[in-house]
Amino acid sequence: MDLARSSIKLFIANIFGAGLQFLGITFFARELGASQMGVFFLFQALLGIVAIPADFGLRGAVEKRISEGIQPGEYLSSAIILKLIPISLIILSIVVFEQRINGYLGGDFAVYLALAIILQETAQLAVSVLKGELRVGETAELNIIRRITWVGGGFLLVSSGLDAEALIYSLLAGMVVTLAWGLSKISTSLKKPSFKNARSLFNYSKYSVVSSIGGYFYSWMDVAIIGIFLTQSHVGAYETAWRVTAITMLFSQAVASTIFPQVSQWSSKNEQQQIESVISNSITPSMLLVIPAFFGILVFSDEIMGIVFGSEFTIASYVLIILAGEKILQSVHVIIGRSLQALNQPGLAARATVISVVLNLILNVILILSFGIVGAAVATALSFAVNTVLHAHYLSSFVSIKFQYSQIGWCTVSSLIMAGVLFGFKTLVGVNSLIQLFIGIFFGMLVYTTITLLYQPIRETAFKNLIRLVPI
């Protein structure tokens, strides 16, 4: 598998999908307002939380075992049987607590939550199989199709007069399309399941689920707690800020998704030197976009939240800055965390995750009650910093982690210069409209890219990967 080419292919697809999703969220936020957006985000948060026991880490286990190339069909069949048990229990629980769930969400959406968990788990299992088959690049089109369905369907339904339910209906439609497309793509055939394969999956998933808990807690626990203590408008503003900063992680996530199956394969062959090389060479590209994004958001946070989404979203301007800074840590964590799991060390990843999850939960309750949604952002950043340090410590016990400090430093200097230029643009020209904001962002990107490419090692790596992307 060509790591650079797969990463860039996935990144390009993610850019398109994220751009489409950003336009969708912008339209929905302007049409529905922060409160209705909050209802939808709470639905997604609850879906993310119930997905933890519904999956129990099996998707990660399937990707790991299939990537090893031994009895993939048997592992897939065993995984399907294992997943039926927790999914059935989750659906039963949703039925029992339907009224309470509807009250929390602010509408009669519990039945759609049950349907969503079924569709999501089956669709994501198909995606995990593709990744395990070392066909990560092919998952790019699945993400695009899912987002096109959500945005397109949501646009039509919102335009017809529906509120938050429009976004939920289109979300379900996107899952259906992803499932159908994914099933048509995978080449692994179902074989007779076995207790041995099921036990192997469980032995991996019992640790992988803890890392999954960390991921879901990181993505949704702050939103869920905000929904308990604050208003749906706060939920809508906070999660919108989160979605903006998530765009900066697109390339980092593409790189991390690509290296996992490859590192897993090398690990099974004890090719440590290649593993160390790919980890070192992946960290800098992973940070390439998040560093300038933080400095750009530092200058334009009020304008992004107010001009793009509306004045009621400006309550999350400081949240936007804090979460953008946190993404710098996440860009390192996604590489280190996925590498640790690929080395078949889910237990250590689980240990780090448990510590950070407990810290995240405690800090969120304390800081949200004290500082509102800004406290939620601080809690997330602090707990994730601890998580990253612990993962790095555990990974360093098996392989050498080398940071390319000169390249990272050059990106930081380039970002500082860009921020100075943007501040001058904001002061002299002013940013009072979408056009002015987009011009400022484009100008900042141009300045950063130009200065960054002046550094020869970065320039040579960028051009080499660009050439590898183009088929000959």
UniProtKB/Swiss-Prot annotation:
Membrane topology classification: Multi-pass membrane protein
Role: Flippase involved in N-glycan biosynthetic pathway that takes place under low-salt conditions (1.75 M instead of 3.4 M). Participates in the formation of the tetrasaccharide present at 'Asn-532' of S-layer glycoprotein Csg, consisting of a sulfated hexose, 2 hexoses and rhamnose. Probably moves the tetrasaccharide from the cytosolic to the extracytosolic side of the membrane.
Pathways per UniProt: Protein modification; protein glycosylation; Cell surface structure biogenesis; S-layer biogenesis
Family: Belongs to the AglR/Agl15 family.
Subcellular location: Cell membrane
Reported phenotype of the disruption mutant: Impaired formation of the tetrasaccharide present at 'Asn-532' of S-layer glycoprotein Csg. The complete tetrasaccharide is formed but does not make it to the S-layer glycoprotein Csg. No effect on 'Asn-47' and 'Asn-117' glycosylation of S-layer glycoprotein Csg.
Domain of life where this protein originates: Archaea
Residue spans crossing the bilayer: 8-28, 38-58, 77-97, 109-129, 164-184, 209-229, 244-264, 289-309, 315-335, 354-374, 375-395, 408-428, 434-454
Keyword Zinc: no
Signal peptide residues on this chain, from the entry's feature table: none
Any one GO biological process: S-layer organization
UniProt protein name: Probable low-salt glycan biosynthesis flippase Agl15
Gene this chain is encoded by: agl15
Intrachain S-S bonds: none
